[in-house]
C-alpha cells in the first residue's frame, strides 16, 4: 500500500487506508506495508489505525536506516519494518554521501536496534540491481547476523530482465540463510515477468501493488503475479482470487487512478469481446478466445457491439435481453448496429434495446421516468440537486449533493430509486464533445452494475447535466427491466 500510494497524485486518508487494508486482509494478503511512519503525524495516525484494526495480516512500516524512523514505527504498533538500505554505489555516494563500510555498519546497527524492540525486520537493498553483488551479499549477511528475519532485493528503477533475475535469485536463495523477497518496478514493462522469475528461482515473497500502482511506471501488479502463479504455474498462493476484481475497483475508486482498459485481468477490455469471429468461437467454447474464466477473479465476460460485431454477437445480446427475433429481424438489427459502428458511434446496451424494440415493433414503457429536476450550484454553494421521478407509477421526490452538479444529480437519482435499484453502482462515466463550440453536443456514456450484471448506456444533449441524467436513466431502466 505504501508504494502504491507513492503514485503521483495519490494521497490516501486514514479512512481510505483502512478500507483498502481490510480488503487486502479479506484477500488473505500476508503482509501489508501500511505506510512510512516518518512521513508525518497524519501518516502515523493512519498506520496506527491499520495496525490496530484487528487484521490477520502482518502490518509493516517503511523505514530508512535511521533509528528515529524505527522509533516512529514503534509508536504506530506495527508488527514489522521494511528497513531500506541504499546498496548501489550511485545511491551510497550521491544520496546519503557515505562509503560502503559505513553503510554496512549502520544497516546492521539499526537492524539490531529494531530487533531489540521486538520488531520483525525485512532488510531491503535499495537499487540492488545496480549494486555490486558481493557487497549486496555482505550487507545481507551482516543483517542476518544482526537478527534480520527476511531480506529483499529491490529492482528500484526496473532494470532487471527475467534471465538475469533467475541467475541472481538462484545464487542468493542458495547462499543466504534467510528468506528473500523480490521488489520490482515496471519501467520497462517487465515487473511481473521479473517477479515471477524470482519466485521460480527461490524467492519466498513478492512485493506487489493492486493495479500495478507506484512511482513512475508503477510496481509489479498483484493481480498479474497471483494469476500467473495460480493459472500458469498451478501454484496455490492462498489468495482469495475471486476478490481480485472487486479490490481492483475499490483501489481505483479510492485513489482516483483509473485502470487502463487493456490492463491485464482487471482492465475493462480484458474479458470483453466485439469481433464476430471471436464471439462465434466463444459460443462454441469459451476457451477459444479466453485464457481463463473471468469468474475466477470475480468478473464476467462482456460482449460489446460495434462495427466489428457479428451476427453471433447480436443473437447472444438479444437472448440476454429476453427478446426473440427471426432471421430477417436479426439481419435488420445487425445492419443497423453495423451502420452505427461505421459512423464511429459506441453502441451501448440501451442503443441495442431501442434498435431491437423498433425492428420487433415492441414498445416497453420505461419503469423509471424523469418528471423534472433542479440544480443549484455556484462558487460558494455546495452543488445540490432535487429530482422528481416516476418509479413504477409511484412519484418520488429526492435530493442529493455532490462534488459538482453532475455528481449531485446522479446522487439524487440513486436515492430516488433505492427501493428498486438499491445496489446499483456507477462503474464508469465518460464524456465526449461530439461537435465543437460552446454549444457542442455532448455524449455521456455510463457503465452501471447490479449484483454482478453490467450494462452500458448513453445520453446526448448540448447540456452535460441533461446528457448525464439521460444516460443514467437509460441504464437504470435496462437494469430494472432485466430483473
Curated annotation (Swiss-Prot):
One of its GO terms (biological process) is isoleucine biosynthetic process. GO terms for molecular function: (R)-citramalate synthase activity; 2-isopropylmalate synthase activity. It holds the Pfam family HMGL-like. Its EC number is 2.3.3.21. Residues 1-245 form the Pyruvate carboxyltransferase domain. Keywords: Amino-acid biosynthesis, Branched-chain amino acid biosynthesis, Isoleucine biosynthesis, Transferase. It catalyses: pyruvate + acetyl-CoA + H2O = (3R)-citramalate + CoA + H(+). The keyword Coiled coil does not apply. The keyword Transferase applies. Pathway: Amino-acid biosynthesis; L-isoleucine biosynthesis; 2-oxobutanoate from pyruvate: step 1/3. Catalyzes the condensation of pyruvate and acetyl-coenzyme A to form (R)-citramalate. Homodimer. Belongs to the alpha-IPM synthase/homocitrate synthase family. This is Putative (R)-citramalate synthase CimA. The gene is cimA.
Amino acid at each position: 500500500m505504501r508504494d502504491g500510494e507513492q503514485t503521483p497524485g495519490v494521497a490516501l486518508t486514514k479512512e481510505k487506508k483502512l478500507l483498502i487494508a481490510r480488503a487486502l486482509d479479506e484477500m488473505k494478503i500476508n503482509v501489508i506495508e501500511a505506510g512510512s511512519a516518518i512521513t508525518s503525524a497524519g501518516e502515523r495516525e493512519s498506520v496506527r489505525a491499520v495496525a490496530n484494526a484487528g487484521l490477520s495480516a502482518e502490518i509493516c512500516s517503511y523505514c530508512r536506516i535511521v533509528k528515529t524512523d524505527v522509533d516512529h514505527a514503534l509508536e504506530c504498533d506495527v508488527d514489522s519494518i521494511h528497513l531500506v538500505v541504499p546498496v548501489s554505489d550511485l545511491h551510497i555516494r550521491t544520496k546519503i554521501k557515505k562509503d560502503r563500510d559505513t553503510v554496512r555498519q549502520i544497516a546492521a546497527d539499526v537492524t539490531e536496534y529494531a530487533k531489540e524492540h521486538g520488531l520483525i525486520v525485512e532488510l531491503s537493498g535499495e537499487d540492488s540491481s545496480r549494486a555490486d553483488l558481493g557487497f549486496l551479499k555482505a550487507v545481507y549477511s551482516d543483517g542476518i547476523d544482526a537478527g534480520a528475519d527476511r531480506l529483499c532485493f529491490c529492482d528500484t528503477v526496473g532494470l532487471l530482465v527475467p534471465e538475469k533475475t533467475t541467475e541472481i535469485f538462484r545464487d542468493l536463495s542458495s547462499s543466504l540463510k534467510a528468506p528473500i523477497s523480490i521488489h520490482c518496478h515496471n519501467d520497462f514493462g517487465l515487473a511481473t515477468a521479473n517477479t515471477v522469475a524470482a519466485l521460480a528461482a527461490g524467492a519466498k515473497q513478492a512485493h506487489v501493488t493492486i493495479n500495478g500502482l507506484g512511482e513512475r511506471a508503477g510496481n509489479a501488479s498483484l493481480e498479474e503475479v497471483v494469476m500467473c502463479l495460480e493459472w500458469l504455474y498451478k501454484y496455490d498462493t492462498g489468495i482469495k482470487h475471486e476478490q481480485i476484481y472487486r479490490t481492483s475497483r475499490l483501489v481505483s475508486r479510492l485513489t482516483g487512478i483509473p485502470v487502463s482498459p487493456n490492463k491485464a485481468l482487471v482492465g475493462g477490455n480484458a474479458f470483453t469481446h466485439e469481433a464476430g469471429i471471436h464471439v462465434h468461437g466463444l459460443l462454441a467454447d469459451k476457451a477459444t478466445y479466453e485464457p481463463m474464466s473471468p469468474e475466477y477473479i470475480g468478473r464476467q465476460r462482456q460482449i460489446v457491439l460495434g462495427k466489428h460485431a457479428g451476427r453471433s454477437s447480436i443473437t447472444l445480446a438479444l437472448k440476454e435481453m429476453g427478446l426473440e427475433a427471426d432471421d430477417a429481424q436479426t439481419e435488420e438489427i445487425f445492419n443497423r448496429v453495423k451502420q452505427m459502428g461505421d459512423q464511429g458511434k459506441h453502441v451501448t446496451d440501451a442503443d441495442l434495446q431501442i434498435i431491437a424494440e423498433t425492428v420487433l415493433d415492441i414498445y416497453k414503457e420505461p419503469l423509471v421516468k424523469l418528471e423534472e429536476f433542479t440544480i443549484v450550484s455556484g462558487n460558494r454553494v455546495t452543488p445540490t440537486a432535487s429530482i422528481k421521478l416516476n418509479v413504477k407509477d409511484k412519484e418520488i421526490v429526492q435530493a442529493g449533493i455532490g462534488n459538482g452538479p453532475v455528481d449531485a444529480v446522479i446522487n439524487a437519482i440513486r436515492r430516488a430509486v433505492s427501493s428498486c435499484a438499491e445496489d446499483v453502482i456507477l462503474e464508469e462515466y465518460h464524456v465526449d464533445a461530439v461537435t465543437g463550440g460552446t454549444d457542442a453536443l455532448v455524449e455521456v456514456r455510463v457503465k452501471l452494475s447490479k449484483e454482478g450484471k453490467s450494462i452500458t448506456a448513453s445520453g446526448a444533449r448540448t447540456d452535460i447535466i441533461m446528457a448525464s441524467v439521460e444516460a443514467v436513466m437509460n441504464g437504470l431502466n435496462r437494469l430494472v427491466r432485466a430483473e
